[in-house]
A protein has these predicted regions:
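Secretory targeting and sorting signals
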Residues: 2-26
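Sequence signature of WD/YWTD-type beta-propeller architectures
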Residues: 21-318
Length: 318
């Protein structure tokens, strides 16, 4: 995300060692396929996929490192999102360009920006697979908002924004609602907001929970949202929580107790029975899954220096 243009850079700098800005995407109903995520290769980020059993780790993208002046933490290929049919992965290219690619690494498509000097980032598919929602920052107007466009950039339209900008859009499985992250006054902590896909009134869905992390996701049946808490304080543990779209029924799924224990939500599985997330212990990370009630937790990729981020569980290609 081009946080240098918006207040979102403040949070990214404050907790750069704590979280990584990651968009959130709806998981659409289907059979469980491969899990996509970004990881740092030492020369920028790339998109990877892996089977739910931890086998078949595959590097999808091989993009060139960003030019000077772009945050290394967001350069390369970041923020993957699966298309509903499993044939495409949308992602952010070097922070401020929308792109998509087939999961076998072929067919790269880059959407030309229509925001001179600005940023278009964090794409997520709509349930019909024909459109992308994304964050757009226009320095000419200082407008940071959620937009929607066709897969090739056609038919662009502004959807809405929150009290402190808008980031990490996600469309509900029924295609009617877009949720996104925004800063809230007076403490500039992040919360999730919602707006209709055609625009209209914006409402706050979640409490701030000391700052919601950038990644959140809809359950495939639209009944709940998953996210993590405590983005605003690196001296606190991070836990995965779920909530109903009307803001009721907050439920904690993990029970980390110390600041070196951090669970960062990824997404629901397409069959709606699992949640994938990153568990951190100190400087080690593991790709984990658990049932939607927090039970059955186990590792897909064990604890190591390899750090999966912006995790999105895709469907078996139709």
């Amino acid at each position: 995300m081009k946080r240098a243009y918006t207040a979102f850079i403040v949070l990214g700098v404050m907790v750069a060692a704590f979280i990584v800005a990651s968009p959130a995407y709806a998981t659409f109903p289907g059979h469980n396929g491969r899990i996509a995520f970004q990881a740092d290769t030492g020369a920028g980020n790339q998109i990877y996929t892996v089977r739910p059993n931890g086998h078949g780790l595959f590097q999808v993208t091989h993009v060139k490192p960003a030019a000077a002046g772009i945050d290394p933490g967001t350069s390369g290929a970041t923020t993957p999102d699966w298309s509903p049919d499993g044939h495409w992965i949308a992602f952010s290219l070097n922070e401020c360009t929308v792109a998509r690619i087939h999961p076998n690494g072929t067919g790269l498509r880059v959407v030309a920006s229509q925001t001179p000097g600005g940023c278009e980032t964090d794409p997520a598919f709509t349930p019909d697979g024909h459109h992308l929602v994304f964050e757009r920052f226009d320095p000419a107007t200082n407008d940071d908002a959620i937009w929607i466009m066709g897969l090739n950039g056609e038919g662009r339209r502004r959807v809405g924004t929150g009290p402190g900008g808008a980031a990490t859009p996600e469309v509900s499985p029924d295609g009617q609602t877009v949720t996104f992250l925004s800063f809230t006054p007076p403490d500039d902590l992040t919360a999730i907001f919602a707006v209709g896909i055609h625009g209209g009134p914006v409402r706050q869905v979640t409490p701030t929970l000391n700052g919601i992390t950038f990644k959140h996701d809809w359950a495939p049946d639209g009944s709940r949202l998953v996210m993590s808490d405590n983005a605003g304080n690196p001296d606190l543990p991070v836990n995965v929580v779920t909530i109903r779209p009307d803001g009721t029924g907050l439920k904690y799924l993990t029970d980390n107790q110390t600041p070196d224990q951090r669970a960062f939500a990824g997404s629901y599985s397409p069959n709606g029975k699992w949640i994938v997330f990153r568990q951190e212990r100190g400087d080690q990370s593991a790709l984990m899954v658990m049932r939607t009630n927090g039970q059955g937790m186990h590792a897909i990729l064990p604890f190591s220096d390899f750090r999966p981020r912006s995790i999105d569980w895709g469907p078996v290609p139709s």
